[in-house]
Amino acid sequence: MKVIIDEQVHQAILEFYAISMRLHPTLDEETVLAKVERLIGAMYDLGKHPFIYADARLKKSWMAAEYKETIVEDFHIAYRVETDEDGEQYVAIYDAVHSKLYY
């Protein structure tokens, strides 16, 4: 199944790691890049098994929008399976928040 990641999700991930690198000098760019690649890869893998995850519980707005939620690399990912005009289903990822920023 095709996966579409909202631009704000990319921004949230990049901003989190940019700030993390400034706050933690021991966190190097190579490590961050590897984490981002694993995170993005896992989001695209949602297209293989989008229905196995539970309904979102982290944010009220996610619950109201009936998103599903998964956690990858300490990021909570909010997504929903949508249907396009041709009747094809796809995964739309709408939001992401790191556990350290939410709790």
Question: What residue ranges belong to the model's regions?
Answer:
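Basic, Lys/Arg-enriched alpha-helical interface segments
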Residues: 1-67
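Enriched for short, Lys/Arg-rich terminal
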Residues: 67-103
